[in-house]
């Protein structure tokens, strides 16, 4: 048992250490020195092997010793090996390799082969990335070749090469992560593994970095999002998510094209940021010597085109909002918006039900999907896209949820109503950052008491006019508009309304928005004189609709983070502390029909 009288040793004339502590430190230093010596010896061994042509067969290691190096050492050795190939006249980056058949097609075409089959009369060329390399004795090497989301085994046998030296030379220079081309015959091993049996393997592009093993995978989210290429190499489920995203966009295009809509493109930089209540990004145009705003929504341009006689238009593209980043928000995001002359919001509800229910059935095979809002380990929810979707009236349902009678909707623009809503938020502990306008207070209450009830698709309808400066007034309920938002799993994915086409009323609402902006609401709209002038030429009865592609993709891929469905999400620089993922973002109280 150690005692306080344990003898001490002075180190560098300063700190006093016990003999046990000194012994521990000396042992640790010795162990570190041995490790460094071993790595140095291994590095020199690999460099020597690189500098001279190998004259022995590959052993079971097949470069496995290199896997024990730290990443920097591995990169150095691999880079020098590739440079040596260039010196000896071997091009590690050839211009072209003709591929006869994809890996997927190869598997479909030859999976019927029997164990032990070898089609020597069929020669094909395939290509892919090496994910595993393993030797069986000195004359047989297996590779796992991956690409297109599938795996094909390469069974390299020395007897199929011109000489054993050629077999050794070709296979000794290949490592995990390399992209190779393989020319050979289809076959199956005795155990029934479909393989291509090569006559020749060509290095097409070496991987200079140590590739993580598939067994362990790439799980660190920071690395996955910043190095999406590596994420795609190692995680096939990521590839599948973006395939689903592509299918969603393809389905929407096909659906709208069949309804006679024309796909259009509108400016992404604007003098005035219109079409939604949101904070814009500002850029500068050198030639024009003026600030421009990245678009927050394309709505106003679309309605101008309807004025011009293009009755059905749609656009799938990026929007930019200078707001926070969280699990469901990214500063740039993708929407689909369409505008349909001679239609109202009732028509668009039917179109929305038909589009989304058909899409979900087409992509997943069922109207019902399972979603985990808190991640794979969290609670699972069943989301049912079977039409018709649930519909609720915003103000009526809010009164039921709050257990209070709100002022008449015709009085929602008064200070008295604002004060009542303010008091309710205080009493219900609902946070609303300033400015505490009627529209913002209503939006927070709806989020707290109505949106949380929307698991399966639910239309929240008939928003107050004060929340919807671009929507047409309700034909039978004063103070309300003909607008709906579609919520799924408590999140808005669609926004639509019968469009306001009275130029006088539109100008009045723009002026009210200008007052809100002057009062400190930096998300309020600007007055767009060009749009008001266009309305004066006559906008036919029109309905407009917008949907967030990113959020819909989250639901259909069971992803609870928007970064999972964006190939290259917004990230803070690595030298800054990453806090963006936890930032709370106020939901926009109105929108173009965009999310």
Swiss-Prot record:
EC number: 2.7.7.-, 6.1.1.6
Basic and acidic residues bias locations: 7-44
Residue numbers carrying Phosphothreonine: 589
UniProt keyword Kinase present: no
Chief place where the protein resides: cytoplasm
Chain positions found as N-acetylalanine: 2
GO MF assignments: ATP binding; ATP:ADP adenylyltransferase activity; lysine-tRNA ligase activity; nucleic acid binding; scaffold protein binding
UniProt: substrate binding residues: 275, 299, 337, 339, 495, 499
Matching Pfam families: tRNA-synt_2, tRNA_anti-codon
Keyword line: Acetylation, Aminoacyl-tRNA synthetase, ATP-binding, Cell membrane, Cytoplasm, Ligase, Membrane, Nucleotide-binding, Nucleus, Phosphoprotein, Protein biosynthesis, Secreted, Transferase
N6-acetyllysine, modified sites: 86, 139
Modification after translation (UniProt): Phosphorylated on a serine residue after mast cell stimulation with immunoglobulin E (IgE).
Subcellular localization, as worded in the UniProt entry: Cytoplasm, Cytosol; Cytoplasm; Nucleus; Cell membrane
Composition-biased stretches (Low complexity): 580-595
Protein family (similarity comment): Belongs to the class-II aminoacyl-tRNA synthetase family.
Notes on the domains: The N-terminal domain (1-65) is a functional tRNA-binding domain and is involved in the interaction with DARS, but has a repulsive role in the binding to EEF1A1. A central domain (208-259) is involved in homodimerization. The C-terminal domain (452-597) is not required for interaction with AIMP2.
Subunit structure: Homodimer. Part of the multisynthetase complex (MSC), a multisubunit complex that groups tRNA ligases for Arg (RARS), Asp (DARS), Gln (QARS), Ile (IARS), Leu (LARS), Lys (KARS), Met (MARS) the bifunctional ligase for Glu and Pro (EPRS) and the auxiliary subunits AIMP1/p43, AIMP2/p38 and EEF1E1/p18. Interacts with AIMP2 (via N-terminus) and MITF. Interacts with TARSL2.
Role this protein plays: Catalyzes the specific attachment of an amino acid to its cognate tRNA in a 2 step reaction: the amino acid (AA) is first activated by ATP to form AA-AMP and then transferred to the acceptor end of the tRNA. When secreted, acts as a signaling molecule that induces immune response through the activation of monocyte/macrophages. Catalyzes the synthesis of the signaling molecule diadenosine tetraphosphate (Ap4A), and thereby mediates disruption of the complex between HINT1 and MITF and the concomitant activation of MITF transcriptional activity.
Note: It is likely that the same gene provides both this cytoplasmic isoform and an additional mitochondrial isoform.
Protein name: Lysine--tRNA ligase
Taxonomic lineage: Eukaryota, Metazoa, Chordata, Craniata, Vertebrata
Name of the gene: Kars1
